[in-house]
């Protein structure tokens, strides 16, 4: 079952989510939108098992990273009718 990982622009570039992921689904990429000049990216979502450790590790009040499991993926991305 595939999962979607969405990184929001409230990411502060702290790397907590990247370090929390046991399967290296996430990585940091350059971004000028925060002081850290980097943002989380999810280039390997096919490896995501939906453990949501990245969500738990996120220190922002906005939960800058979200994992949408299976059926949630279509609904959360606005693709379901």
UniProtKB/Swiss-Prot annotation:
One Pfam entry name: Fer4_7
A Gene Ontology biological process term: photosynthetic electron transport in photosystem I
Cofactor or coenzyme needed: [4Fe-4S] cluster
UniProt entry tagged with the keyword Ligase: no
Main location per the UniProt record: membrane
Binding site for [4Fe-4S] cluster 2: 21, 48, 51, 54
PROSITE patterns on file: 4FE4S_FER_1, 4FE4S_FER_2
Protein name, per record: Photosystem I iron-sulfur center
Organism: Prochlorococcus marinus (strain MIT 9312)
Highest classification ranks of the organism: Bacteria, Bacillati, Cyanobacteriota, Cyanophyceae, Synechococcales
